[in-house]
């Protein structure tokens, strides 16, 4: 059941990136990136790495909030173009269906294998990778967390100054 969920999230992730690549309007492009980021983190969480999925989701959405605010402010349209009349998205959907059908016909089955080790043996104790990631993030990786937070702060400040200068 878990692999079916991962497979479904993966297909939706590809459709989210196709929706971004067809980019009918910057507002919809930012929305599709946020949805794709959420689906990517859902894949990580469904593979039992909850902390990594949460951290990536928060950091990614922090960056996407900046980008989404910038694109929405700089390219405001009264009637934004939608995905309905876009030939890029429809041709990508057709290409995806053809590739998936060819893969199924050539292999005879759709099989997804996964070899992920969930536990590390450290000193005779079983320590989950999820919990060791927490200690590494706040231990040796604390400088990276502070640096990323500072970069996001500077970026939002620059975006707000650019948007303020346009009026």
UniProtKB/Swiss-Prot annotation:
One of its GO terms (biological process) is mitochondrial electron transport, NADH to ubiquinone. It catalyses: a ubiquinone + NADH + 5 H(+)(in) = a ubiquinol + NAD(+) + 4 H(+)(out). The chain crosses the membrane at residues 1-21, 27-47, 50-70, 88-108, 143-163. It is a multi-pass membrane protein. Keywords: Electron transport, Membrane, Mitochondrion, Mitochondrion inner membrane, NAD, Respiratory chain, Translocase, Transmembrane, Transmembrane helix, Transport, Ubiquinone. It is an enzyme of class 7 (translocase). Pfam families: Oxidored_q3. One of its GO terms (cellular component) is mitochondrial inner membrane. GO terms for molecular function: NADH dehydrogenase (ubiquinone) activity. Its main location: mitochondrion. It is found in: Mitochondrion inner membrane. Its EC number is 7.1.1.2. Core subunit of respiratory chain NADH dehydrogenase (Complex I) which is composed of 45 different subunits. Belongs to the complex I subunit 6 family. PANTHER family: NADH UBIQUINONE OXIDOREDUCTASE SUBUNIT ND6 (PTHR11435), NADH-UBIQUINONE OXIDOREDUCTASE CHAIN 6 (PTHR11435:SF1). Core subunit of the mitochondrial membrane respiratory chain NADH dehydrogenase (Complex I) which catalyzes electron transfer from NADH through the respiratory chain, using ubiquinone as an electron acceptor. Essential for the catalytic activity and assembly of complex I. This is NADH-ubiquinone oxidoreductase chain 6. The gene is MT-ND6.
